[in-house]
Amino acid sequence: MRGRSYTPSPPRGYGRRGRSPSPRGRFGGSRDSDLPTSLLVRNLRHDCRQEDLRRPFEQFGPVKDIYLPRDYYTGDPRGFGFIQFMDPADAAEAKHQMDGYLLLGRELTVVFAEENRKKPTEMRTRDRGGRSNRFQDRRRSPPRYSRSPPPRRGRRSRSRSRGYNSPPAKRHQSRSVSPQDRRYEKERSYSRSPPHNGSRVRSGSPGRVKSHSRSPRRSVSPRKNRSYTPEQARSQSPVPRQSRSPTPVPRGAQNGDRSPSQ
């Protein structure tokens, strides 16, 4: 019993004791590794070299690397650089002391670098992909760009629907009416109006209305109809109507009346 109870207990206790210091050591080591060791130095002259930066910064501790990025296409310096220290404490001290330092006639701005040094290939992909990512972000961001256009489209569609169904479309048609069509509308109104005089009723015959629809220029204006007297209109209009009428009864009656007279 003692052997059974004793044998499992040491591994459990040992395992617990062994697990407890390990996270402490991990957290302690992670704190040292997570602290920044790289500094971003801005406002550098274009002719600044690595030796010009190494001399003033090495007084705070050993410097691991100095990087002055250049444009991938032109090869010109960008006016900033990265300095990486071996110890995070040295980097913090250098940042505090060198911020605002005059180097080659320019006041430096020193801050902690968010990322470590990148290779030229990474800088090239970043330059090329920066523009495309911006457009992708604009396409993906729904609140600014996807929600704003629909109300504008809705307004345009409403305005168009109103334009087709509302009276403004009639106004557009009334503006496009030519003076010849206006004359035709006046003649129509005369033909539809109740007959005040015989001349107006006879002048608005259906045959003439059809001629107006085909060739409005040759149509007779209502002013000329007004100049005719009722006697002239009666003498001219009944003759074609009697000739076109298909009823043969009056002709037989006329022949019968003439036979006894002869």
UniProtKB/Swiss-Prot annotation:
Start-end of Basic and acidic residues biased regions: 115-140, 180-190
Biased composition (Low complexity): 234-246
Pfam family, one: RRM_1
Basic residues composition bias: residue spans: 150-161, 209-226
Keyword Phosphoprotein included in the entry's annotation: yes
Source species, domain of life: Eukaryota
Post-translational modification Phosphoserine, affected residues: S9, S20, S166, S174, S176, S178, S191, S193, S235, S259, S261
Gene3D superfamilies attached to this UniProt entry: 3.30.70.330
Domain called RRM: residue spans: 37-115
Keywords: mRNA processing, mRNA splicing, Nucleus, Phosphoprotein, RNA-binding, Spliceosome
Disruption phenotype: No effect on alternative splicing, due to the redundancy with SCL33. Scl33 and scl30a double mutant shows altered splicing.
GO cellular component: cytosol; nuclear speck; spliceosomal complex
Subcellular compartments: Nucleus speckle
Gene Ontology molecular function, alphabetical: mRNA binding
GO BP of this protein: mRNA splicing, via spliceosome; RNA splicing
Annotated region described as Disordered, given as residue ranges: 1-38, 115-262
Subunit structure: Component of the spliceosome. Interacts with SNRNP35, CYP59 and RS2Z33.
Similarity field: Belongs to the splicing factor SR family. SCL subfamily.
Protein name stated in the entry: Serine/arginine-rich SC35-like splicing factor SCL30A
